[in-house]
Amino acid sequence: MNFDLENLVRENIKNLTPYSSARKEFSGAAQIFLDANENSFGSPLAQNYNRYPDPQQTEIKEKIAKWNNVEPSEIFVSNGSDEAIDLLFRIFGEPNRDEVIICPPTYGMYKVSAEINAVRTKKVFLTSDFQLDIQNIRQAIDNRTKLIFICSPNNPTGNLMRRDAILKIVGSFRGIVVVDEAYIHFSPEKSLVSEINDFPNLVVLQTFSKAWGLAGLRIGLAFANEEIIKLFNRVKPPYNVSQIAQEAILKALENKSQVEKTIAGIIAEREKLIENLREFSFVTKIYPSDANFVLVKTTDAETIYKFLLDEKIVVRNRNNVELCAGCLRITIGTTEENEALLNSLKKLATEDTERTEKFQTG
């Protein structure tokens, strides 16, 4: 494969002069900051947040780089993974000309971001066992295809994509392959971050929203070769990650062992929930999961979904998603939350039985 990054980047991005702050240009430790029109008198809060945050999130990158055996220059910290997804389209997708390949059923923001950025979406559906259709993906690629998005473990199906299949696509495609690993920490497979130095067109996305339990902070990560990361930094807003979020992430990174225990607990609850869901006659299939949720095929997803809403329990109705007819996606909750879900489903099952008996005797 001949990979030419320069040829993939939009012309306006190549010519872009990124926003530059005086602090970025200053070398050394300044003591007085009169450059950014901040409020030097502070705020009503006890802790001062009157200064802009580190635009490069240096400390976070240094810690994460050590864990992943990469360089800090190979990491981009984003305002949630959705920012990184959007920036990929801005960097590589020429509006009204270029194309992206997605593999439904998959995470919906790939298509939304493509449409916002006027990039045409090509759909190559997963196989019947929710794996990549390599042959059809290759056939869908043409000279306008700039990006391929792969979600692994996949949302909403929950399963890992085969590593060898992903790498075959990465190795043969001259554009950018984005592997979204939002749920990788719940799976037995190691991350593809280890492959970024062997594949210059590979971008791996991760997040602090799932395993780390920090969805409210909106922090995502992109791992890629240094030249791609430079493009992210050129296009991103100058202060895309808040000071509060950066401080919280650094604090969380000190408690990795607690996160590992949480992951183990979620996986244990996942397996227990799967076993209990099998007892219901309206559950026809539970798909294998490498994530913190399960995709459940039912006889009547709409009725079950509405019943649970009445019980004040919200699950995700995937009935109208390609290849997911009759399916609900259920996040693994706490033991108490899962028990409440099961009790509500038992209530529904009892009502179904009573209705059936009444019909038969009537």
Please annotate each region the language model reported:
Residues N201-E279, I286:
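PLP-dependent aminotransferase class I/II
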Residues I91-S113, T127:
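Conserved PLP-anchoring active-site segment centered on the Schiff-base-forming lysine
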Residues S128-S187:
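Active-site phosphate-binding strand-loop segment of PLP-dependent enzymes
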Residues I266-I267, E279-E311:
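Conserved PLP-binding catalytic core of the aspartate aminotransferase-like
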Residues M1-E59, K63-K66:
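N-terminal "arm"/small-domain region of PLP-dependent enzymes with the aminotransferase-like
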Residues P104, R120-S128, Q206, R318-N319:
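Short beta->alpha connector loops at strand-helix junctions that form conserved
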Residues Q57-E99, N117, T298:
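Phosphate-binding glycine-rich loop
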Residues D164, D310-E311, N320-T353, K358-G362:
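PLP-dependent enzyme catalytic core of the Aspartate aminotransferase-like
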